[in-house]
Amino acid sequence: MAFKKRFTPRRKFCRFCADKDLPINYKRPDILRDFVTERGKIIARRITGTCAHHQRLLTTEIKRARQMALLFYTSTHSSDVLKKSSL
């Protein structure tokens, strides 16, 4: 009788705890884009692996970057969709 090995997922770690020099700042949208889906939703910490403290900071900075128009609320705007459908 063959026994199946149990799958043990790799332990997720917080990128910001591991690298203290990596800033969480609204002025760095290239870093913030890693934590936002294509549709503009903020990815949960159980998926990204960030700790609770840094997840709270990430959420506020992503929202701040959206208000400053450094990040989009969604990936495509409704005007782009209307242009494509009219062609």
Swiss-Prot record:
Q: Name one GO biological process term.
A: translation
Statement: the UniProt record of this protein carries the keyword Ribonucleoprotein: yes
Tell me the PROSITE patterns matching this sequence.
Answer: RIBOSOMAL_S18 (PS00057)
Q: Tell me the keywords, alphabetical order.
A: Ribonucleoprotein, Ribosomal protein, RNA-binding, rRNA-binding
Highest rank taxon of the organism: Bacteria
The record ties this protein, via InterPro entries, to: Ribosomal_bS18, Ribosomal_bS18_CS, Ribosomal_bS18_sf
The entry assigns this protein to a family as follows: Belongs to the bacterial ribosomal protein bS18 family.
Question: How is this protein named in the record?
Answer: Small ribosomal subunit protein bS18
